[in-house]
Each structure stands twice: as structure tokens, then as C-alpha cells.
């Protein structure tokens, strides 16, 4: 399933490949003197971002040099035949950018795509890289709905099955300049709305009102104008049929939610470099602006375009249970990282719904991690599991209850035995004091006999 996809019925083609969604934040700021104050300002900004994400229950971790070359190397050196990520050896005496690229790496630039070639273990691999960027601002966008662009819950066929990188590059524009621009725009539109121009173009009144509200938010510091570039980079095998399927999957998935994407003919190399960390600050974002592919919107609207997926992988091991968006996830209720204070679990379902099919893998994961399991089975549903795992299956029909087992002092244990017999004698309610007293006398008499 991880290599291709889950088996499906005849005539059904759903992209049910396993996923491992990750979000990486990179930030670069111009600095002429490279002073300690600039570094301290950036460190404080990173702390604010991490604290904000932690407030939304999104855990983060800092990327060190080893993690950096592993992440960027995985983004650059894509091998469609590789199933596991490759860990690279960090050389502290060499620049990081040279350590991210394989020695056998070659890249061919085409008009409509890029071709990436590698050679590993005596075998050549070729991958095709496709890029698509946002043609215009969407009419409406919600942060909770962004994941439907690449893994739709209600329409699973509108999903992206190939590996991809979704990049959102943004720059907050100067507040004073944007405020002045909004003032000029508002004054011009308001002037036109009071003339005969408004009779020919009725929308000018609405535009004047919107620019008036925007300048108020900019003046009070409640909002900012952001220039952003949204791009998706997809990797697939180097053949035309597969590339066409990937292209249609991406365009249709985003179009479903009102996002119009286009393929940057003759500019795939530019878009591919955009997904790499810190490249936008090296003059690439200026090239994007000159090409006219950068969009503008308020900071609130751009924040709703962030590529976040609310699917948690839960635990590093346990029962494999992918989410609805095919995120690779595991269930282990005893994992300490989940901070569980109650390890009880209830499973409900009709007959034949698969309750036993869920619990059996959980039992296997507990046994594989060194634990033990005790099952009270009514219906022999766990008999084969017990035999396969080398356990001991006890038939309840041959068992007998001895309430006096392991008792050495009847004076200390008589009331406990009395309580056990009370439950057996009256399972639907408590006995009164008279009957409990008679049972206690019977327990002592039986022990002495």
C-alpha cells in the first residue's frame, strides 16, 4: 500500500496512497551588519511563532544542520523507486548546500517540466517535476478547508496521489506605503462614486467602501497587506501518461475549492527553486514579482492559505490506522507521549462490524512491545489469536470458582468472600443486612467444616 495503493474493487480508482504530511517554516530577513541584535530579533520571532503553534496544539521542533540536509536532500533528490528516506552524513567542514545534492544528480530543464536523474546502487532513476502556481486570488478560502485541495474528504477521487510540495512564500509589505496607497485609492474611488461614473460602473461604490475599511485597518495596525506566491511542486515517473494524470488530479482538486492553478511554461526551474528554504530572500521573490505571478491580499486572508493538515500521526508505533486523509498514523493507548491518564477503551458496533478485527491488532501491538494481554472471550472470537500468539486459552465450562483459595486467616478474609457470594446471589441489587449476616455466618461455618 505504501509503494502503490490499497487494493480497490473493479472500476474504482481512488488515490489511497499513504501520506506523511509535514510543515516546514523558513524565515529570512535582510541584514547589513549581521549584528547580535538582528540575530536576537530573529530568535525572538521564532519563539513567538512556535508559541503560537503550540497554542493551537501543533508541536514543533527546531531544525539543526543534520535535519536540514536530510530535509532539503529529500526535496531535491527525489527517487520514485525509493520507499525510505535517506539519512545523509553531516560534514561539519563543508557547506550545507553542497551536502544536500547527490553527486549523481542531474537536472534537465524542459518547457513544460523538469527531468531529475539519479544513480543509486548501480541503477538509474528518472523523475519528472511539475509545477503549478496560483493564477489569481481565490474568491474565498478557509484554513480548515485548505487540506481538501490535496486530499478531499467528501470526494476522495479529488486528491493528489503523487509526492508533492506545497509552498507558500509571503512578504509583508511596508505598512506606511500600503496605508498611503489605500488612502489614494479610497479618495479616487469615493470621488468617482459621486459622479456620473458610478452610473456606468455601479461597483465603484462597493470598491470605495472596501478600500475605506482597509485603510482604517491599516491605519490602526489591525491588518497588513501581504504579497504571496502559492506553488505546488509534484514529483512523478518520467512518462507522459503518468504526468498527464498527475496534472489533471492537481488542477481538478484545487479547482473544486475555487483555486485556479496554471503551469508556468518555460519557468518550471524558477518555481522549483521557490520551494527550497531561503531562496526567496536571495532575489527570487523579486523575479516572481517582475513576472506578475505574485498575488496581494490582507494578512488574514493569506493566513487562511497556509498548508496545514489537522491529522496527527499520534504515536511512532502501534496499530497502523491511517486517517481519512491517508496520513500515516498509529494507535498505542499506552504511549507516554499521548499523556493519557485513563487507559480504558470501549468499542461499540453491530454484529459483524469488525470489533474483533480492531482489537486483535491492538493486542498484537501490545504483545510485540513486551506487554501482556488477558481477554475474557464470549464466542471464541479470540481463540485462534491466542493459539497463533502462543497463549493459553482456558475453557470457561471447565473452570470452577473457589472463594476460599489462598486464604490463611478467615477472620481477615471472611467479609471479602461474603461480598463475592453476595454478588453471585443477587447480581441485580444489594442484599440487606440480615441476608449479609447469614452469608457471613455460612462462610465461617464452611471454613471451619
Q: Which residues fall in each region the model found?
A:
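Core mixed alpha/beta domains of very large multi-subunit molecular machines
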Residues: 282-328, 336
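Short, intrinsically disordered, charge-balanced linker/junction segments flanking boundaries
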Residues: 1, 448-449
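Generic recognition of flexible, low-complexity loop/linker segments
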Residues: 11-13, 154, 217-221, 317-319, ...
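Extended, folded cores of ATP/NTP-driven motor/assembly subunits in large transport
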Residues: 1-302
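Short, solvent-exposed loop/turn segments at the edges of secondary structure
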Residues: 18-20, 225-227, 324, 340-342, ...
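Glycine-rich phosphate-binding loop of nucleotide-binding enzymes
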Residues: 1, 315-396
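Switch/coupling segment of Walker-type NTPase motor domains
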Residues: 14-16, 360-448
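Residues in well-ordered beta-strands of folded domains
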Residues: 26-28, 167-169, 233, 319-322, ...
Amino acid at each position: 500500500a505504501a509503494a502503490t495503493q490499497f487494493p480497490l474493487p473493479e472500476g474504482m480508482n481512488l488515490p489511497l496512497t499513504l501520506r506523511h504530511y509535514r510543515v516546514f517554516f523558513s524565515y529570512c530577513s535582510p541584514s547589513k551588519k549581521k549584528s547580535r541584535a538582528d540575530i536576537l530579533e530573529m530568535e525572538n520571532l521564532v519563539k513567538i511563532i512556535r508559541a503560537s503553534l503550540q497554542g493551537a496544539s501543533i508541536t514543533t521542533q527546531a531544525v539543526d544542520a543534520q535535519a536540514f540536509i536530510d530535509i532539503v536532500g529529500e526535496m531535491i533528490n527525489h527517487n520514485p523507486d525509493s520507499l525510505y528516506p535517506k539519512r545523509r552524513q553531516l560534514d561539519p567542514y563543508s557547506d550545507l548546500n553542497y551536502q544536500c545534492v547527490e553527486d549523481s544528480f542531474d537536472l534537465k530543464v524542459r518547457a513544460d517540466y523538469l527531468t531529475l536523474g539519479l544513480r543509486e546502487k548501480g541503477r538509474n532513476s528518472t523523475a519528472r517535476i511539475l509545477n503549478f502556481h496560483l493564477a489569481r486570488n481565490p474568491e474565498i478560502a478557509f484554513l480548515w478547508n485548505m487540506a481538501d485541495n490535496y486530499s478531499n474528504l467528501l470526494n476522495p477521487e479529488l486528491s493528489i496521489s503523487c509526492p508533492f510540495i506545497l509552498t507558500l512564500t509571503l512578504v509583508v509589505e511596508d505598512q506606511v506605503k500600503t496605508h498611503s496607497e489605500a488612502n489614494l485609492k479610497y479618495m479616487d474611488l469615493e470621488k468617482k462614486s459621486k459622479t456620473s461614473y458610478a452610473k456606468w460602473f455601479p461597483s465603484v461604490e462597493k470598491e470605495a467602501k472596501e478600500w475605506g475599511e482597509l485603510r482604517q485597518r491599516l491605519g490602526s495596525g489591525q491588518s497588513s497587506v501581504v504579497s504571496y506566491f502559492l506553488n505546488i511542486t509534484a514529483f512523478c515517473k518520467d512518462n507522459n501518461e503518468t504526468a498527464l494524470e498527475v496534472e489533471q488530479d492537481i488542477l481538478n482538486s484545487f479547482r473544486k475549492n475555487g483555486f485556479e492553478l496554471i503551469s508556468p511554461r518555460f519557468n518550471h526551474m524558477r518555481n522549483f527553486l521557490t520551494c527550497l528554504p531561503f531562496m526567496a530572500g536571495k532575489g527570487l521573490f523579486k523575479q516572481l514579482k517582475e513576472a506578475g505571478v505574485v498575488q496581494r491580499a490582507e494578512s488574514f486572508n493569506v493566513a487562511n492559505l497556509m498548508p496545514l493538515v489537522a491529522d496527527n500521526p499520534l504515536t511512532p508505533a502501534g496499530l497502523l490506522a491511517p486517517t481519512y486523509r491517508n496520513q500515516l498514523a498509529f494507535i498505542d493507548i499506552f504511549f507516554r507521549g499521548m499523556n493519557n491518564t485513563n487507559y480504558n477503551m470501549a468499542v461499540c458496533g453491530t454484529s459483524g462490524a469488525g470489533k474483533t478485527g480492531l482489537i486483535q491488532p491492538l493486542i498484537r501491538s501490545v504483545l510485540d512491545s513486551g506487554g501482556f494481554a488477558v481477554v475474557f472471550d464470549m464466542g471464541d472470537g479470540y481463540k485462534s489469536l491466542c493459539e497463533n500468539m502462543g497463549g493459553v486459552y482456558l475453557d470457561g465450562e471447565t473452570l470452577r470458582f473457589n472463594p476460599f483459595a489462598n486464604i490463611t486467616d478467615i477472620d481477615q478474609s471472611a467479609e471479602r468472600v461474603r461480598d463475592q457470594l453476595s454478588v453471585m446471589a443477587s447480581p441485580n441489587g444489594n442484599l440487606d443486612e440480615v441476608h449479609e449476616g447469614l452469608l457471613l455466618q455460612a462462610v465461617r461455618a464452611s471454613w471451619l467444616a
